[in-house]
Regions:
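Active-site loop-to-helix "anion-binding N-cap" substructures in soluble metabolic enzymes
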Residues: 1-235
Length: 235
């Protein structure tokens, strides 16, 4: 299966940074790997990338299409700027009260408008039961009838901590996610791994069942980030 790499820039960067991304990415050499760049909303217009296998995403999306959503940005607005992916349910959104039910609404809004949601799921601590993954997936997909989505497994305790699960733990989690989607009638779904992925461990993580990565911090180190992307493509 073709690998997918998603760069979540979170609340980082400025106009000059995204100009550098725009220029640097022209020299990126990828053949079989798809790359999605997710800058903050205000910098989406700064990334006009006319290349196959490189797409623009966002870090959140409105939960409804109504115009009565102060502070939200709807799918039709995003599509005007070439957005084709949206991260939904990231742990940092869940930490400020975003529920499984709200995630499911955002998933519906995305797929109803031709935007592919990247649905984030993950357990809070090393001791947490992985059954939470099953619940998160089932509720997230409860309102849709399409396989146009991606799931990103991010153990919350690993994000930005420098710690990562063992490969066996990652495989166990991904197997639970894929078994859940298969029982719901969705086959061949991409499941990414996210959480402290860097230039030193990505090759080992490629031996897991993950279909790619959701990246955070390393996305800001452009030389290392693009080297990682090319390394995945050549693996």
């Amino acid at each position: 299966m073709q690998k997918l790499i998603v760069a979540n820039y979170k609340m980082n960067g400025d106009v000059e940074f995204y100009k550098t991304v725009q220029q640097t990415i022209k020299n990126l050499k990828v053949k079989d790997t798809e790359l999605v760049l997710c800058p903050p909303f205000v910098y989406v217009p700064n990334l006009k990338i006319n290349r196959t296998k490189i797409s623009i995403g966002v870090q959140d999306i409105a939960c409804e299409e109504t115009n009565k959503c102060t502070g939200q940005i709807g799918p039709n607005m995003l599509k005007e700027f070439g957005v084709t992916y949206a991260i939904v349910g990231h742990s940092e959104r869940r930490q400020i009260g975003e529920s499984n039910e709200l995630v499911s609404k955002k998933v519906l809004t995305s797929v109803s408008n031709g935007i592919t949601p990247i649905i984030c799921v993950g357990e809070q601590s090393k001791q947490s039961s992985l059954n939470v993954l099953k619940t998160q997936v089932q509720i997230a997909l409860s309102k849709i009838k399409t396989d146009k989505f991606v799931i990103a497994y991010e153990p919350v305790w690993a994000i930005g901590s420098g710690e990562i699960p063992t490969n066996n733990q990652i495989n166990k989690a991904i197997n639970i996610i894929k078994e859940t989607t298969q029982k719901m009638g969705y086959n061949n779904i991409k499941v990414l791994y996210g959480g402290s992925v860097n230039e030193n461990n990505y090759k080992d993580l490629l031996t897991t069942a993950a279909d790619g990565f959701l990246l955070g911090g390393i996305s800001l180190k452009l030389d290392k980030f693009f080297a990682l992307v090319e390394g995945v493509d050549n693996a």
